[in-house]
């Protein structure tokens, strides 16, 4: 963590000491996240889908190297269901998990002109993620009778951690004032404070942004 912060500060100071160029981008995109949970010898995964929206500010040296920082709202939803029967009575259950995050990516980037209107770039760095909301809604049925358990606030359990740091990178292109990019981030921290349960998440993103 300290090395990451020191690297970011050093790169920022280097750009400030040179003739830097700043650019704002505002964008939205698709998210696909997979949470992997290990409790003892039992391993389970929960895929979720959603979207992100926010803005990013990039400072470059005008020669292809830059550093960017942004703030994004992320929304993810996942559902898991199962069915069975006991003594001839049909049973069913479904759990829906909704999560919202504030994500702050800090990325180093390298870019190169393809032609007068097209630029390609690579980016990599950490994303500091703070959970804003996490709920689980349970639904079930017994013999055709539907039941609901209501929504449970997952953060009411002190063992579930709001904070996460993800590391990753991606590729993108700028065409005029339009940006397309794809990225992948891997969670570094255990989302549970308990030693008996380990949960980490990976996030794939694809989005579009407008450059100003």
What residue ranges belong to the model's regions?
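A short, acidic, flexible beta-alpha connecting loop/helix-capping segment that sits on the rim
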Residues: 185-189
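Outer membrane beta-barrel transmembrane domains
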Residues: 160-165, 170, 174, 179-183, ...
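Extracellular/periplasm-exposed beta-strand and loop segments of Gram-negative cell-envelope proteins
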Residues: 34-48, 76-101, 131-168, 190-192, ...
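Bacterial Sec-dependent N-terminal signal peptides
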Residues: 1-29, 208-212
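Short glycine/proline- and aromatic-enriched beta-strand/turn motifs that initiate or cap beta-hairpins
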Residues: 20-56
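Repeated loop/turn-to-beta-strand initiation elements of outer-membrane beta-barrel proteins
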Residues: 24, 63-67, 177-182
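Gram-negative (and chloroplast) outer-membrane scaffold detector with strong preference
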Residues: 28-30, 56-139, 204-212
């Amino acid at each position: 963590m300290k090395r990451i912060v020191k690297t970011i500060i050093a790169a920022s100071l280097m750009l400030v000491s040179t003739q830097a160029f700043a650019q704002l981008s505002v964008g939205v995109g698709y998210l696909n996240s997979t949470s992997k949970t290990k409790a003892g010898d039992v391993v389970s995964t929960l895929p979720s889908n959603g979207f992100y929206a926010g803005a990013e500010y990039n400072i470059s040296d005008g020669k292809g190297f830059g550093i960017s920082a942004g703030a994004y709202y992320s929304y993810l939803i996942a559902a898991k269901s199962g069915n069975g029967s006991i003594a001839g009575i049909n049973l069913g259950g479904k759990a829906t998990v909704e999560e919202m995050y504030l994500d702050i990516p800090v990325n180093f980037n390298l870019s190169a002109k393809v032609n007068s209107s097209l630029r390609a770039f690579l980016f990599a760095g950490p994303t500091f993620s703070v959970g804003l909301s996490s709920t689980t809604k349970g639904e079930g049925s017994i013999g055709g009778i539907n039941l609901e358990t209501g929504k449970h606030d997952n953060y009411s359990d002190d063992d579930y951690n709001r904070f996460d740091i993800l590391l990753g990178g991606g590729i993108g292109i700028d065409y005029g004032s339009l940006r397309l990019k794809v990225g992948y981030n891997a969670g570094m921290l255990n989302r549970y404070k308990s030693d008996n349960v380990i949960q980490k998440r990976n996030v794939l993103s694809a989005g579009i942004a407008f450059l100003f």
